[in-house]
Amino acid sequence: MNKSILDGRYQTIFAGKKTIMSGITGKIKNQVDAIWMSFWTGGITNSIDVLEQMTYLFFMKMLDDAQLSQEAKAAMMGMGDIELPDAVFKKGLWHNPDTQKDVPYKNLRWSEFRNFTPEQMFDTVRFDVFNFIKHLSDAKTSAYSRFMSDAVFLIQQPRTLVKVVEGINGLDMNDRDTMGDVYEYVLGKMAASGTNGQFRSPRHIIRMMVELMEPKLTDRICDPAMGTAGFLVESTKYVKAAYQQELLKKQNAQHYRKGMFSGFDTDPKMLRIGSMNLMLNGVDDPDVRAQDSLSNQNTTEGYYTLIMANPPFSGTLDYEVVNDTLLAKTRTKKTELLFMTLFIRMLELGGRCASIVPDGVLFGTSTAHIALRKELVDNQRLEAIISMPSGVFKPYAGVSTAIVIFTKTNSQSTDKVWFYDMKADGFSLDDKRNEIQENDIPDIIQRFHNLEGEASRTRKDQSFFVPAQEIRDNDYSLAINKYKEVERERVVYDAPEVILGRFEQLQNEITEAMNEFKTKYMK
């Protein structure tokens, strides 16, 4: 049953032109813009560095805000003088292992150091607070803190830190819904700045894929090429909206916070950014790991119920670094083929996958390309191929892509495959990506969730079914143009003698004009 989420936090595209997030107010956007500008004027101009430094300070404030909230509750119960058993900031002194000095725990708290003089604040944050949150990884306070060991504090001027702290202080870190939207807005600024955009999949495409797959509260969801955790975060929003009452139960809430979401990446910056993105959306301890998903580090098999991903597809790997179980299925160096093989391995029976792939996966003629498509059609249940226009990833890339949706069955269960030819996604397909009226996304979701109504569609329509046997007969090609019928208008031309007569008349007019010109001007 399709869940149309219309609670104001996650409005589906059924409610209008495209998926719309309720978003943040103009006031908060202005606050974030001012924080961003403070970094730039302070000499930090690389957008991913800005995001990282902002993330560190978010974490500092989150830790203090959380403890302040716990302390307020304890005080109401008459236990204000008793130290909280799980307090991050304890009573007494913290020994800084980097400076070998003892520092009062209270000085490490946002609510304290924000009132220091600029120079005192700068020294405290740079030498003490930053080192404190780096060493929190020893206690595994959160998924985020586990990836702080190689973090670097880049703010170089006290006045820059003061401006940023003042800006962040106006944000309520305990309001996870708003903070999740704030972080999404910051990620959007990172992409809009024109650098590091390769890390960011288009959010409206991610939201479409989440709507297509309809995550369930019982799912174990993974993105083996996590990046900023876009697929996982959009899944959290869907689940929170769809299962609001069920999440009040302790067991469900625990699964949501700890066991439901997994993500892997090799870049420490992405691990920190992705973990913070999840934390700000209420997932404090996801299974986020620093690992190469295609290597022998990753031994997961038959575990996840849902995988959604946009894996890297521009590179090749040496056989030596690829997991043997993947090469046994698909002997190739191409990452896009290896990741698809990996997804099959990591899913449990009945598990589902939606992945973005380059078009070459659909029609490549190498042995590995054909073997992968054969595996999907003959040994799994391939459900849908959604072909997307090449401009979807602009301005960062112009490659044509598609979404592949399948269920792991390990048996021949593909009867027919649904194809959709997306022509518009709500934005212009040039580098500017301006918002436009044309948008196929609502139609895609509506049709995918009502496939029984697609049986009458013809190859001349924008979506249609293709029998599995026809795909086998065409070397397992999944290119939509292989099966789509293009209706061409019959063009009726005039008879040859009529056309020749026009040429003769035109030639006579040209000769007449030339003679007139010579008579007037060339005597």
Question: What are the functions of these language-model segments?
Answer:
Residues 50, 266-273, 288, 333-406:
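Conserved Class I SAM-dependent methyltransferase catalytic core
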Residues 381-382, 394-444:
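C-terminal, active-site-flanking charged/polar segments
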Residues 195-309, 314-318, 324-325, 333, ...:
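Conserved S-adenosyl-L-methionine
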Residues 23, 45, 318-335, 360-368, ...:
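Short, contiguous acidic/charged loop-to-helix segments that flank catalytic cores in large enzymes
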Residues 279, 312, 348-352, 362, ...:
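Hydrophobic alpha-helix feature that most strongly marks membrane-spanning transmembrane helices
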